[in-house]
Amino acid sequence: MAAQKKYICAFCARAFTRSEHKQRHERSHTNEKPFHCLHCTSSFVRRDLLQRHCRTVHHTNLNPSTLPSNKSLKNPTTNPLDLSNNEGTTTTTKTGNRKNNSNKNGAKNDKSTNPNPAVSNDDNRSSVGDITTQLPFQVQFNTQLPYQQQQQQQQQQQYPILQNQGIPMKQSFSMESDQHSLTTFDSPTSSLGVSMTPSGSTNSEIVLQQQQQTTKRRKRSQENNSNNNTKLIAKELNHDLVHLLSITKKLTTLLQHYDNVKVNITDSFLIGYVHIQQQAKNFTIFEKILKDLVYYLNTYHINNLQQQNQFPPSQQQNHYTINHFKIGISYCVIALGFLIDHKPNRAIQFFKKSWNLLIKTLIPQYNSNNNLLDQIEILYNLFLLCYIYLQFNLETFDINEKQHEHHSYEQGDEHEDHHQEQVYINNQVILNYLNDISFIIASNLKDVATNNLIDHNLNLFWNIYILLSSYITKEPPKIHQILLNKNLKQNDTLVSLMQKFSKSFINMDMDDEQLKLVVVAALNNELKLYFNDTVDEFEPENSKNKRKFIYDNRNVLHNAIILINKSINFYNPSASLVNDAKMFELKLFELFKKNLIINSPMKYHELFNNYIFIPQHYYHWQLLTLTLKEINQNNVIFNQIHSILTTTTGSNVCFSFIDFENLLKNSFLNYKANPIVINNNLLIISYPIIILSNYLNLDNLMTSMGQMNQLQFINLNIFIIEWYLIMMKVLIIIWDDTLIDFEDNYILQTLMYILLDNKSCLLKRLNIDTSKLEYDVNCERLSFNQKWFWIIKLKFDSIFENWMNFLKNKNNNVTNNSNVTNTSTTGITNTNHNHNDSYLHHFNVNVSNFKFNLNKYLNEYFVTGDFKFREQLDQNDPDQFQGSMSMDEEPDFTTAMQTSQTINSFMPIHNHNSRNQVYQQHNQDTPMTSRRDSTNINENNIAQTSSFISNSNYQGSNSNNMINYNEFQDRNYKRSSSITLGILAQTV
């Protein structure tokens, strides 16, 4: 029997029987040539090619022993680059466990083990990680304490304010791991891995007793130290809370003197402060914003305001020491607290204060005095305003609506809202402000004399870059070209780091969220430059040609996408710092994953192990969306779906969907005119969606959904819809294209494997050895005919429906819990809640309409389409009719369409009479009697369903038809039903 091809290429999924063959093949993707000629500049992929070159060109014979072997070379798709090394050398990993990549001195861990290690005096030349693996425990403990004290002193000197203002400093990942390693040793010799005294020695018992006594004393000492540290942390925390309350009281007095604010802002400021502090992991600039604000409030004296009244009005400005930028930041924090506390009217009031202060006072004031430091302060305020506006989707609120419930305000504040000016703002406006102003300021700071200023505030520009890249869909941020050559990680610029991903995946720090966000943002902008047709009409032609791409061509871009996914989507459940409930769900998912791998053919193991993971953060979903974008390069699909889902006018929805149908029929679904490349990217996006669709009821498994905002939920809905359309196109290719070699395509094989409930159907077709696998002898062989087409299509329908219902419920929960509620604390209805609730209602209705119409159109397209199935039903083949139906009935696709219509029986239907007429005419001209009869039966069923829905669910005859949402509001997303041949046969 031929050897199984279990070694899979990381870029094209081509299979090989030997690992060195796979390694050489992957070099053709990465253009890696590790064998260099010593006589010239030539390099080669294989060693024998170098030997032939030297023999024929230079007339010399190389000694084979001096050349590296294929096994000695590092495989860049298996062994990652370690960013902690300045030289970027590769580091080996063991069976999916990632090595700690950030030692205290920035050096690698030495993985070599020595049975008799000697204590070296050259401690300065080795890292702390090396010391801990070589020295006894007592020496380790004594050598690490001074280092920890020194690092803490350095942190206190660098951040003196943080020790007093309640902003905890996050220790490095290496510090946490090293502290954890101290508690894992049970004896002084456990780190050595050997016994210092032979077991047969007479002194062994004495030594063992001494070791046990020493261990007990050490454990007691560690417990005492741990208790002391806990008490110290609790004492500092109490001090920080008291200090934070004191500066909040000072802020209240400051705002009363500044603009006569008489609202109690203590609770809202604390709520907003804590929220921003929690978000500092994703946007690290928040930590500095809070630190500077607390420092200002801590050092500002209230008596300065009292002394102001002692001077005439002409001199008050010189003695008025209030920092307007910090006032704007304070307004933002207070507005954020009111939003989280379900008081949107109050939040908008303070948001408008901060916006008007920035736009009408601070920016014009900078234009007059031209203070360079004010530019950075402007960006701080504008970034925080933009974050709040987008995160809480304030575009759905009527920000200029006058409040008529004056009694809902506190005494003395009823007329304050009328004095505020109108604010004309939406998502596009605030993004344009941040995009333009950040580019202008960064361009001003690029001068040689002020270049240090932009480098010292580079973290601010990286955070702006992340935010703009996520929400601007058509083009990269204007600061993209400026930041390409700025240092991102140690000595790596953004360009150099991204180019490393085209040749190897990188061992990234699991806690460095900002680095991952920047990498995803850079990849997003690169794809915008490659695939977006729309460019700035005012941009000169010469500058368009000078746009700098990170990757030279699309093949290199494809390699980078594959390796970035492998670097960021790496998942190690044992290293995740999660709570017990989430850890239980993650362990359960790991069991499901291992069960799938163990029971699958060996040649599928590598693909399943690499690509099945849980998207735990929104940037994981962003990366999957970008991976899908490379497959579907037609961005018109994305724009059309976004327009249909976000419109608020019913007539526009119908009109847009008609255009969308034409786009699908004439362009997208025609794989011959618009082909797609079936490669590993298809598996990267499909595995998580298909596998997780069965476990969506495990609430703790998808905790990232609770942290998303409404705009992110919209993008996620579009991603699932676009993936579903891609799967429909792939389904057509598999069943129609005779050039597809399914028996040698591991991508399509594994896709069918995880879809089918009865895996034996696929194994029987591929003639795979099933001696070690669960196998059903009586199963039907998978065939590319009508019946199996509808079986797989219904399976995709079920997965799509589960995900859409799951996202709908999650979006409703997030909106109701984190943004606004029906009533305020005073009992008065929040008027802005109606706007937000109406927006969510329109979105849910649009999604429901779109799902139903899409499913209806696709079923009609597959029945009336001109594509032919690769295989026809063979009446003489017993495998195709074992326990099913006879050829005379042939209602396979009819049953499938009826079942598909039943899935969405509660959805509104889009009536299009002209399409039904064409549909009937096509049936009259079809020579196949069985198809014509079956289609007519299904059409009557559709018509009955349409009349039932229109009578029961629609209210009114206007374009703003409102669906009776209560009928399917509580429908839970269910596990994918088993759509097997037996079930399909029973329905006939």
UniProtKB/Swiss-Prot annotation:
Subcellular location: Nucleus
Cellular component terms per the entry's GO annotation: chromatin; nucleus
Biased composition, class Polar residues, residue ranges: 59-83, 113-129, 174-208
Gene name of the record: TRY5
Name assigned to this protein: Transcriptional regulator of yeast form adherence 5
Species for this entry: Candida albicans (strain SC5314 / ATCC MYA-2876) (Yeast)
Keywords from the named record: Cell adhesion, Metal-binding, Nucleus, Repeat, Transcription, Transcription regulation, Zinc, Zinc-finger
Disruption phenotype: Decreases cell adherence to silicone substrate.
Keyword hit for Glycoprotein: no
Low complexity composition bias: residue spans: 84-106
Source organism superkingdom: Eukaryota
GO BP terms, alphabetized: cell adhesion; positive regulation of cell adhesion involved in single-species biofilm formation; positive regulation of cell-substrate adhesion; regulation of transcription by RNA polymerase II; single-species biofilm formation on inanimate substrate
Sequence segments annotated as region (Disordered): 59-129, 174-229
Biological function: Transcription factor required for yeast cell adherence to silicone substrate.
